[in-house]
Amino acid sequence: YERKHIGILEQVRRYVHLPVIVKLGMNLTNPVALINQLYANGAAAVVMFNRPYRPDIQIENVHFHAGEMWTRPSDICDALRWVGICSARIPNLGYAVSGGVHDGWAVVKSLLAGASAVEVCTTLFWNGPHRIEVMKEQMMQWMEEHGYDNIPKEWKTFLSGKQNDDVVFIKNLMQIATLLIKAAHQKFKK
């Protein structure tokens, strides 16, 4: 499955002479390895993550129908995690966060994680195009409160693991959570 990304990128680059950005799905076995291969094969940036169609089942009429299509602010967490990890390992690639970007603070979080762009959709449907201005004002407010006049280059590596141990902390936390889940599973199996 993941090798198909490389083949598609190679085909697109054969016919297009513009920077190619690859939008990735969330269900990857090794995002760092895949993104490294995409970078090696000429990707200019990656977007994390595509939100696939999510069907639901209508139990009264017993048929498939559209599931929840809107993102929630909490949907940003996986993208923040992986942008932070990947931008530390493959720093010369561009990163964009997609999913859960509903306000200016989510933009700040994305930039601090290592992204250079965000994709915004749900909040524009809900609030209209003027939401972009509100998000910009929120971001500017945060920057002013923290002594920034502009977006410095250091933001790209601020929380990406180069200047602190947050990425190691997150990895360790995920390993502990996995061990706890396995232990709970074993306990209930008995």
PLM features per residue range, with description:
Residues 1-3, 34-92, 127:
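Glycine/Thr-rich beta-alpha phosphate-binding loop at enzyme active sites
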